[in-house]
């Protein structure tokens, strides 16, 4: 599997801003657990999973042409306002893991992502999580998510799950 997700073809749906979305299919990102990411028990340290979520989210968006640095240069910021993780089994040093990322919901000002971390060769879920992001201006005030961002994220005009 290609770690960058290149070649993964996903349909981009064109829509306007709406109250919710049906979940789009997962985008997979593969990476190998580095030694520095583990604790004394040889498990991935719990807070590292939030970094993995960020990697998955950035690659999800990059695959759709919505690169974070480009958005930020246009004054579009997606601040994390909530993050959760449920740990089911540990990943260890040198394990190859898959970060599965998708959007579960979009509102006028917020985007909700879901994540699953699995071994790269299995569907056994090690960690599942979510993040909620508020779209803000450079000054920190809330703003509507621009339509071009909604389009790039590939959401469909359906009710929230």
Predicted regions and their residues:
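Hydrophobic beta-strand-centered segment that forms part of the acyl-chain substrate-binding groove
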Residues: 60-111, 127-128
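Generic structural detector for well-ordered beta-strands
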Residues: 30-34, 86, 134
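Catalytic strand-loop segment that frames the active site of acyl-thioester-processing enzymes
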Residues: 14, 18-62
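Intrinsic, low-complexity polybasic segments
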Residues: 6-7
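Residue-level recognition of specific faces of alpha-helices
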Residues: 49-52, 77-79, 114, 132
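HotDog/MaoC-like acyl-thioester-processing domains
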Residues: 14, 18, 25-29, 62, ...
């Amino acid at each position: 599997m290609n770690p960058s997700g290149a070649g993964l073809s996903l349909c981009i749906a064109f829509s306007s801003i709406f109250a919710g979305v049906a979940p789009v299919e997962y985008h997979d990102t593969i990476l190998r657990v580095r030694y520095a990411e583990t604790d004394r028990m040889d498990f991935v340290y719990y807070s590292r999973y939030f970094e993995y979520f960020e990697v998955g989210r950035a690659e999800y968006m990059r695959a759709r042409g919505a690169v974070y640095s480009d958005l930020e240069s246009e004054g579009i910021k997606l601040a994390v306002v909530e993050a959760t993780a449920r740990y089911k089994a540990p990943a260890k040093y040198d394990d190859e893991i898959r970060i599965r990322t998708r959007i579960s919901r979009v509102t006028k000002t917020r985007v909700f992502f879901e994540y699953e971390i699995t071994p790269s060769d299995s569907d056994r879920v090690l960690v599942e999580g979510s993040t909620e992001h508020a779209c803000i201006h450079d000054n920190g005030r809330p703003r509507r998510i621009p339509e071009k961002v909604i389009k790039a994220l590939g959401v469909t005009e359906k009710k929230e799950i």
